[in-house]
Amino acid sequence: MKNCTLGNETDNSLISNAFGFLRFPLNFQPYSSDADWVITGVPFDMATSGRAGTRHGPGAIRQISTNLAWEGHRWPWHFDMRERLKVVDCGDLVFNFGDAQDMSDKLQAHTEKLLAAGKRCLTFGGDHFVTLPLLRAHAKHFGKMALVHFDAHTDTYANGSKFDHGTMFYHAPNEGLIDPQHSVQIGIRTEHDTNNGFTVLDAAQVNDRGVDDLVAQIKEIVGSLPVYLTFDIDCLDPAFAPGTGTPVVGGLTTDKALKMLRALQPLNIVGMDLVEVSPAYDQSDITALAGATIALDMLYLQAAKK
């Protein structure tokens, strides 16, 4: 239907714009809203190299988030984020199906418009390629940033196509969007280049080291730069997140990931995304629930500063 989607565009998708995260009402005029943070879904998986299906991720995250909406003074924060932070869900980005360039251009423009209006952005993928246009928009507004990146893969591979969910963090430093010397990749457990400047905290050491020790190192690496936080759900072990396109065994537990995430509160996080939830491969919605919980704790990170 027309006039009931982001940008007042006709959306013929069967999987977009169903309901808001955490039962937030959908707001299709986010630029003029009084929101502090705006949630946008990007149902895109054309850049996937393995199993597709992450286009259904935003819907799955929103649907399972209703299980989290009832809790007021949420554990372990002991306050209600909704009383401190104004959050709206503006639904899903509308773009031409089958046109990756159109998605990229529209996501960047949408994000730039939100940032110019004084909003901050939490984005649900979709595959991880969506982070690149998000970084382009944020870098225009904040300048070069530090990247805090949870993933099983570094996504710094130089041999991919223009639209590839494994190449974003090869292109981003080359475009001057992020500073690898002040960026950290967490949970990595696949082959990667060790000479590109990123600090890699591989899954083995993350699983063996304590949270306080790890977070102290992350804070030291990031320094005072504005931070973009991106969480690929395959950072988690497949026992906790089977519903993703490129699962890799030996990953983080949800407990370890959440404890690390919650400890990042002092960082100057200016943008966030949660990507690669693919519900077709999920079991009992545990991947979507992990994603929704991580996204909610991302918002609590911001509310805790109020």
UniProtKB/Swiss-Prot annotation:
Keyword entries, A-Z: Hydrolase, Manganese, Metal-binding, Polyamine biosynthesis, Putrescine biosynthesis, Spermidine biosynthesis
Gene null: resulting phenotype: Cells show a delay in differentiation to swarmer cells and are unable to migrate effectively on agar surfaces. Putrescine restores normal cell differentiation and migration ability.
InterPro entries: Agmatinase, Agmatinase-rel, Ureohydrolase, Ureohydrolase_dom_sf, Ureohydrolase_Mn_BS
GO BP term, example: putrescine biosynthetic process from arginine, via agmatine
EC number: 3.5.3.11
Sequence positions that bind Mn(2+): H128, D151, H153, D155, D232, D234
Transmembrane region(s): none
UniProt enzyme class: hydrolase
Function as written in the Swiss-Prot or TrEMBL entry: Catalyzes the formation of putrescine from agmatine.
Protein name: Agmatinase
Species this protein is from: Proteus mirabilis
Recorded name of the encoding gene: speB
